[in-house]
Amino acid sequence: MKNIKIITGHYGSGKTNFSVNLAVKAAAEGKSAAIVDLDIVNPYFRTADFKDLFEEKGIRLIAPDFARSNLDIPSIQFDVVELAMDEDCLIIDVGGDDAGAVALGRYAEALEQFRDNIEMYYVINQRRYLTNTAEEVTKLMYEIETAARMKHTAIVNNTNLGVETSLEIIEESRSFAEETSRLTGLPVIYTVYPEDIAPLSDKQDVFPAKIYVKPVWG
């Protein structure tokens, strides 16, 4: 199993919630885990907001100094080589769209030596603005890759409507995810289900997720 997982996606795709779940899952399996908050674009949904959770689970957090405020964010500094060597599972949560992926691009050269040990997941949500079709999410994916100077390896279907998410909504999104897979040539590695809905599906790619990230207006 490759131990470096890079998570990208459109704003509101749910990539941060997925990243948090990946880290918690790794820790529950007895692995040493670290999560890098590279989201220096969106002040509302950041992995750094879950510092207490990570401390409880023994997960190492690397984040910008002001990641828990609404201030402009300075560039984040971390030793990606050291983290990759020290941790069983290293998760890098990248900012939304190509603008957020620019920060990842700064580490592309350092990450190159771990190329065979990296999985780069593209998180998609059909129920979000500007990502309703496979063509739209495919175009955005290539823009992210250009900014990041790295290529994705798989797709994560995280289609949801927040608290209104149902089994039907997720199952209906499978054709959208499959078409995205066809256009990009990448496999759909996971389909994310809220943990209370996950047992209702008989599919093989189910990823049960707890909802950690909630809207600031909720």
Language-model segments: residues:
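Conserved lysine of the Walker
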Residues: K15
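Loop/turn-to-beta-strand initiation segments
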Residues: D86-L90, I118-E119
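Switch II (G3) loop of P-loop NTPases
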Residues: P64-S69, D88-L104
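Hydrophobic positions on the alpha1 helix immediately C-terminal to the Walker A/P-loop
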Residues: F18, L22
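Hydrophobic anchor at the beta1->P-loop junction of P-loop NTPases
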Residues: I7
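Walker A (P-loop) phosphate-binding loop of P-loop NTPases
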Residues: G12
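Conserved catalytic-core segment of NTP-binding enzymes
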Residues: A99-K203, V216
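N-terminal phosphate/diphosphate-binding loop that engages ATP/GTP or pyrophosphate donors
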Residues: K25-I73, D79
